[in-house]
């Protein structure tokens, strides 16, 4: 695991160092950020061992890819399985606006909650439950069957439990789970598959 974040992208050297200190003969790298994929691919070319880069763009994609890994399969089979699962992952995030702006037809004010769905702005509001309901509806409309809600460091467990119930109401056909992710910046990271 390499520490990073939205503004702390690891370099090719950081990734290569992590690869080289791993005792595995074959290393799978999950960037979990579109801005890190090229650095991971460059590190893979420089590594002294076999490296497979799975082009994960979000943490939910990375989790899904990890769950698709099977130690009994050949590396090429794992690469195919891990990569194939990515297209079925809907990634939703709730964060906040740092400043006033207009974007994609949304009038955004500093402090507003921002809802993102697969990287696109899906809504903005002062009321987080409105945004959660909207994202739950998107998952239900897309026919997603498994939803994992990772709540961040700034969310109280009772609020996260309320979000879980809201998702269960809006997406009644899905299995919905709640996990304390403890992540900064994002109040919620939501994976729907």
What spans do the regions from the language model cover?
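N-terminal loops that bind phosphate or other acidic moieties
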Residues: 1-193
